Design a protein with these regions (language model features):
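Glycine-rich Rossmann-fold phosphate-binding loop(s) that bind the pyrophosphate
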Residues: 10-13, 177-180, 210, 304
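Short hydrophobic core segments
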Residues: 7-9, 115, 123, 131-142, ...
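Glycine-rich flavin
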Residues: 2-4, 20-148, 154-170, 206-207, ...
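Glycine-rich dinucleotide-binding loop and its adjacent helix/turn
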Residues: 141-196, 275-277, 281-291, 295
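FAD-site-proximal beta/loop scaffold in flavoenzymes
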Residues: 156-168, 258-328
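A structural signal for the hydrophobic beta-strands that form the central parallel beta-sheet
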Residues: 110, 139, 160, 229-231, ...
Length: 477
């Protein structure tokens, strides 16, 4: 007899989320945690909220607030120790929702320790001297920072987004190796706190996976705030000379106080003995089908193990699909079309669907691209954020294929376009939806109306027909 319906191998936020979802199916669920998950995303995002608060405080000076106080906006800053404490509290509150105690109350068997798959003779998981037998297994181990092989890096010492809480003071000079989303966010964050920040990437620009124009605009904002961006540059060596850290980046030698590595993430498979039970994988991701099954049909995977950006909401979606297949019938397929994500710089970058480059590759000249700036939007004028950018990519039949938004609230704005893509809606539907005036969301309507206008110009027969109809009405009135 089997012990469980599903055993979840966790050690990540995704693993705990998956256990909470699985408990709603009223089966027998076990969560194995080889290690306690690090809630670095909650901590990192809480720090960014502090930077957002600092920005808002500076904006209030222009409205006459803080009368009688120091009026030099440039002197406003964060107290690093207080910011760290607040971020830790915020991360703890976020993680408390799926604490081990709460999961146990939901009926989940929580098991601490490392395990490995065995065939005795059937598939099972051995952990702490126990053999756990289950109908299915879900791999949700999360990921760890990818550390590039750089001479002297380990001896020099470095930080990652997971060890940022160990930073005792704001570094005067900070070098960031790699340009993943968290690295870009933190480059701007520390620049706003007064650090001299240099970010070093091998690509031609930051955020190479994103739409080029949107990525260049984010890079321009960082550079305007004092961040030095070294593109197409490889870090050759790091070392400590007379107590000072040095980086050899291309033909430049940089003296820095701290080094932050933000070169992406890689799955941590632990020593699960996966190859013995027929699971194929490489150092970067598992081999999964559309149902999120591995090459062993009784073992599923989700989250960072699937590759792509390490966003929690995408991992949670994958866990939902995998658990539907496990607890119901294996007929549900993962569909990434219409799943949005955002990079929380200032302004933010929100993205969904295809980039301009991808759309041209898939559809050729059958696409239309509509771009607008936020220059003439009243809300953007009030916020002083007129450098925003909105791009909508459509098939010529009106079906929405993708969007990129750069604005202070892009992470909120992108949702309506994501829903439209998810439901297969056309841009005419967006054009028919009134937007609240004096909000950034008015941009949805502006772009949709611009698309309609451009196509009405192309359909000259329609314009001629309407003009003739109006002439006929005037004649007979």
């Amino acid at each position: 007899m089997l012990d469980y319906d599903v055993v979840i191998i966790g050690g990540s936020v995704t693993g705990r989320d998956a256990a909470a979802i699985a408990a709603t199916y009223h089966g027998r669920i076990a969560l194995l945690e080889p290690c306690a998950p690090l809630f670095w995303q909650g901590y990192h995002q809480a720090l960014l909220q502090g930077a957002e608060g600092l920005k808002q405080a500076k904006q209030r000076f222009s409205f006459g607030l803080y009368q009688g106080m120091e009026s030099d906006v440039s002197k406003l800053t964060l107290d690093w120790n207080i910011a760290q404490q607040s971020a830790s509290v915020g991360a703890s509150r976020t993680s408390a929702q799926n604490s081990l105690e709460n999961l146990a109350r939901l009926g989940v068997d929580v098991i601490s320790g490392a395990g490995e798959f065995v065939n005795q003779p059937d598939l099972a998981l051995a952990v702490n001297g126990r053999i756990l037998r289950s109908r299915y297994y879900l791999l949700a181990m999360g990921s760890k920072p990818k550390i590039p092989e750089i001479e002297g890096l380990a001896l020099t010492g470095f930080l990652t987004v997971e060890t940022l809480h160990k930073l005792s003071q704001i570094p005067q000079k900070l070098a960031i190796i790699g340009g993943d989303p968290s690295g870009v966010e933190l480059a701007q964050f520390f620049a706003q706190l007064g650090s001299q920040v240099t970010i070093i990437v091998k690509s031609s620009h930051l955020l190479g996976k994103e739409d080029h124009q949107a990525a260049y605009l984010i890079q321009a904002h960082l550079e305007a705030e004092g961040v030095t961006v070294l593109t197409q540059t490889e870090v050759i060596q790091t070392q400590v000379i007379q107590g000072q850290k040095w980086i050899q980046a291309g033909n430049k030698a940089l003296e820095v106080d701290e080094i932050l590595v933000a070169a992406g993430r890689q799955p941590q498979f632990y020593d699960l003995n996966l190859s013995t039970v027929g699971v194929k994988f490489n150092p970067n991701y598992l081999s999964l089908n559309q149902q999120l099954q591995t090459t062993n049909p009784r073992i599923y995977g989700c989250g960072d193990l699937a590759g792509g950006y390490p966003f929690e909401h995408i991992a949670a979606y994958e866990a939902q699909i995998a658990l539907k297949n496990i607890m119901l019938l294996p007929r549900f397929k993962v569909n990434y079309q219409g799943i949005p994500w955002a990079i929380l710089t200032q302004p933010q970058l929100g993205r969904v669907g295809l980039t301009e480059q991808q759309a041209k590759r898939y559809y050729g000249d059958k696409i239309s691209i509509h771009k607008q700036s936020f220059t003439h939007l009243s809300k953007a004028q009030l916020l002083g954020e007129i450098s925003g950018f909105y791009q909508l990519i459509c098939h010529r039949n009106g079906k929405i294929l993708g969007a990129a938004i750069v604005s202070p609230q892009a992470s909120e704005m992108i949702g309506i376009i994501a829903l439209a893509i998810r439901q297969g809606l056309k841009i005419d539907t967006i054009a028919q939806l009134p937007q609240i005036s004096s909000t950034l969301s008015e941009m949805h309507l502006k772009v949709a109306k611009a698309w309609q206008h451009s196509y009405s110009q192309k359909d000259s027969w329609k314009s001629d027909w309407i003009e003739t109809l109006n002439q006929w009405r005037r004649f007979w009135s």
